[in-house]
């Protein structure tokens, strides 16, 4: 490996030339130590019934060295800026004074151009002032993931950090420091930990990573400071042990039936919108054989914030879809306040984002954001008839499948460096009837797989199927195998997804300008995943469903990261195994040739044993499926 790949920086978005003018430069005195700025973006490919709000603002994290309190911005109180609707939300209210020697983090999300790129503002405290320019970053952290080497270990002891450097020169890293609270209940005041030496470079116009083994970390909030040859880079986020979980949605009604649990287990479902369900969570033998993590309110905290429960909780989620709110959107500040009790706990919060048109104003509210969007015969925030990718009129029953990727990338970038998750459309029994010429009210197997892969290829760290109720599964039995295959593949590639980061994306069109392929890549320290997702699908007029055309010749070109530019193995992978592919190196790129349709996923490694580890995990997934045989007659009997 080159010297810049062993140790690389950690940060959230931050202008590489941030010039913070303060009246207290001594690092031990009151001062503004750093700023993380995440400019708002929109997914321009999305279409809506009414014109979207064009306002682009930014989200901020201010890192303040104490002693300091009584903060104002441009002479105004934070609540005044919220009331004036210049901000979407903030967390200045009820925050304690920052004591001497400690670090306090204050966050807010702008809602007007006044707080967008090209502006500046003055931060005032009782002990210092600082002028902060709002600039687009040249270098930023795109992901921070905390992992545990032992699956049974509650606290993570490994940190994966990726930083993208779009500057024209390398970024030199000198060290890393964590700032941690003295207790989980004191999460708002952070204290410095010893600096970890990390001399390295992030190449210009490229990505680098840092893979650190550390002592077990507390499940609380932390600031990360990276010392560089310029300013320190900063981020603030919750430390949570990351695992790739697969949810079945609202499955609690039938969890007392082993036949249903066998089916869910064979589909690799390990999470659900449950908390305590009679006949399941209070049945120790059943709960042990069919472990399903809870994804719910998880109150009272004194019961659920325990070592016994932590391993059985995916995340806290109870806000529904606040951007929709049942017709009354829930203001972002209300969402922030609803999650406040959990911030002094070890439980990570999650919120459902449902409308890209406005979700930038909700960015940063939870520890583990996710979104829901379904592309066929389902309620939707976007205007399906407005998409012009079709040769004829756009259907009312479906939207471009590839917009799932657009939505995933939007949510990911607005909330980085936190990991994100996605709901993906599965069989559903609740939407019935004849809809604009389409009788089938759930995705067909191809539509189901394509939507899931567009999210996965943009690097999510959990997938939630909507909705694997017993009724829906029995009604659409042809979805079982594609769900099972996606789950098997996810188990096999899980280490690369969790330890990785999104690297590149290209939307490719034909010479005539028609949709062709979406090309996406995810890199990790030991491997790279390449996704070629077919966007040349057509409408089957006989049934009004999307169909992929027969395999066609294709050539895919992917850029390799610096540490994987001499690969030893490149194979096509799927739920059945790994097959040789026709590939060649071309400078910093790999070129793959073949005949493909639907999707093609490739694994690139420098060490051949990584391929064998992939195949071993695939075998583990098959063994799990075999351990939970499905009894169709028993399932049908449950609904008689």
Which residue stretches match the model-derived regions?
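Extracellular/luminal ectodomains and secreted, surface-exposed scaffolds of diverse proteins
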Residues: 33, 42-44, 78-97, 128, ...
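N-terminal secretory signal peptides that target proteins for export/translocation
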Residues: 1-4
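Bacterial N-terminal signal peptides
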Residues: 8-19
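Glycan-processing catalytic domains of CAZymes
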Residues: 25, 29-35, 43-74, 116, ...
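A eukaryote-biased signal for short, well-structured alpha-helical docking elements
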Residues: 25-28, 105-140, 485
